[in-house]
C-alpha cells in the first residue's frame, strides 16, 4: 500500500511525525512524505505556478520512509508528488494530510492548508483524509493522538485499497485534546456553520487577525464543532462539487436568462 503524507504546519512539525508513526504500524505500508519546507497554515487551496518548485529529499527522523521538503503549499506538495515524485504507474493509494495543530471545523475547510492537501488528492483521483487535533493552546502536547488515529488510518487505508471510498469526497477528521480513555466515540458530523468573531489587534508592525470561537451548544444536531467540544472524534465527508443544484434549477425561471435564451450549438 502506497501512502502519501503532507501537512500545512511544515515538514518539521510534530504533528506530521505523529501521523507517520501511526501509519508505519500498518502492515505493508510504503510511506512517502511530501510537505512544505515551512509553515503554510491558512493558505487555502493556493498553488504555485509563477515560481519554481524545488523538492529537496531529506531524512525524516531516521524512519523507513521517503521524504521531500517543498517550497510550496500543501496542494503543491500533493500535485508535485503525484506528477513528479511517484514512479509512473505507482501513484499513491491514499493521501493523509496532518496532523494539524488545532482544529479545522465548519468554514475552516475553506482556509485550511491541511484540508487542501486532502482535497487536492481527490481532485487527482486519490482518496484524501485531513486530520486535525484540538491542541492549539497546547501545541507541543499530542497526548494519545497516535493511539486515537491508528484505527482511523487503518480503516481508511483498507477502504481505499478496496475502492470503497467515494470519489469526489475528502474526509475531514477532528480529534479532541483529551486522554484516549475520555474519547466518547467516533461519529459522522455535519460541518458547523457557526461564525467566528474576527478581531484585529494592532501591533507595532501592523494588524494581526485573532478569532474568537463560537459558544459550544448542546448536541441537538451532529455538528462537528459541538461534537468535538463534547469529546467526540468528528468525521465529515466533504464533497468537492460545490454546485447548488436546487438553485441551478430555479435559475431557469430568471427573466434575464429567459431573455437571452439558450445558446444554439
Curated annotation (Swiss-Prot):
The entry's keywords: Cytoplasm, Hydrolase, Metal-binding, Nucleotide-binding
Q: What is its main location?
A: cytoplasm
Question: How and how many cofactors are bound, per the record note?
Answer: Binds 1 divalent metal cation per subunit.
GO CC terms, sorted = cytoplasm
| Compartments reported by the entry | Cytoplasm
**Cofactor annotation:** a divalent metal cation
**EC number(s) per UniProt?**
3.1.3.5
Q: State whether keyword Transcription applies.
A: no
Q: What class of enzyme is it?
A: hydrolase
Instruction: Quote the NCBIfam families the UniProt record gives.
Output: surE
**What PANTHER family does the entry give?**
5'-NUCLEOTIDASE SURE, PHOSPHATASE, PUTATIVE (AFU_ORTHOLOGUE AFUA_4G01070)-RELATED
What's the protein name?
Answer: 5'-nucleotidase SurE
Name the species this protein comes from. Answer: Brevibacillus brevis (strain 47 / JCM 6285 / NBRC 100599)
Q: What is the lineage of its organism?
A: Bacteria, Bacillati, Bacillota, Bacilli, Bacillales
Quote the gene name from the UniProt entry. Answer: surE
